[in-house]
Amino acid sequence: MIVPIFFLFSLLFSSSHGAIQDFCVADYSAPQGPAGYSCKNPAKVTVDNFVYSGLGITGNTTNLIKAAVTTAFDNQFPGVNGLGISLARPDLAPGGVIPFHTHPGASEIIIVIEGSLCAAFVSSDNKVYLKSLKKGDTMIFPSGLLHFQLNAGKNNALFFVAFNSPNPGLQLVDYALFGNDLATELVAAASFLDPAEIKRLKAVLGGSG
């Protein structure tokens, strides 16, 4: 029952509604504009445009953050284009983390399917909202606020995420600071971090400068 209820949540979470036409399946052959993808000719739309099977596959967590995120955004799932909804599936190995990040274009709601999580977001006045989550728990992360999810347990963790946008955007704080080519001296001046530590993190995260 958990997953069907979650899908209902994702629909209620949407703030966008098709007022002019029933749907706007993404036309990947047309140029993408600021408002998203153009609509596919309805005569060429099939039921397969509204079905996506990618979230049934376990992600590969053999990486630096011991986590994988499989997305069902408008660039993978054409049916969500224009509907104001999308989904994602994060898999976290023990010790895995989705590091501090923001979604500039969307709020999100998660539901834990397997394992447990430590999750938090930080408000604009720097207040932390932290909670340990278990199977079946849900948590909301307001749009644009820094947040993270950590698997502090001994078993793998799986949760699903719903967004009120077909493409919520993503900025990881660590990569924004250290995965770029901004000069170390400037990063140090702007962040108060030690230059040696900045260079170390740039090397780890693929930055330069």
From Swiss-Prot:
Gene3D superfamilies referenced in this protein's UniProt entry, alphabetically: Jelly Rolls (2.60.120.10)
Alphabetical UniProt keywords: Antibiotic, Antimicrobial, Apoplast, Disulfide bond, Fungicide, Glycoprotein, Manganese, Metal-binding, Receptor, Secreted, Signal
pH sensitivity of activity: Antibacterial activity retained between pH 7 and 10.
Residues reported in the UniProt entry to bind Mn(2+): 101, 103, 108, 147
GO molecular function, one term: manganese ion binding
Signal sequence region: 1-18
Main location class: secreted
Thermal behaviour (record text): Antibacterial activity retained between 10 and 70 degrees Celsius.
Disulfide bonds: 24-39
Pfam families: Cupin_1
Gene Ontology CC, one term: apoplast
Family stated for the protein in its record: Belongs to the germin family.
Purpose: Has antibacterial activity against B.subtilis (MIC=5 ug), B.cereus (MIC=50 ug), A.hydrophila (MIC=2.5 ug), S.marcescens(MIC=10 ug), S.enterica (MIC=10 ug), P.entomophila (MIC=2.5 ug) and P.rhodesiae (MIC=10 ug). Has antifungal activity against F.solani KACC 40384 and F.oxysporum KACC 40032. Probably has no oxalate oxidase activity even if the active site is conserved.
PANTHER family the UniProt entry points to: GERMIN-LIKE PROTEIN SUBFAMILY 3 MEMBER 3 (PTHR31238)
Protein name per UniProt: Germin-like protein
Organism: Morus alba (White mulberry)
Lineage: Eukaryota, Viridiplantae, Streptophyta, Embryophyta, Tracheophyta
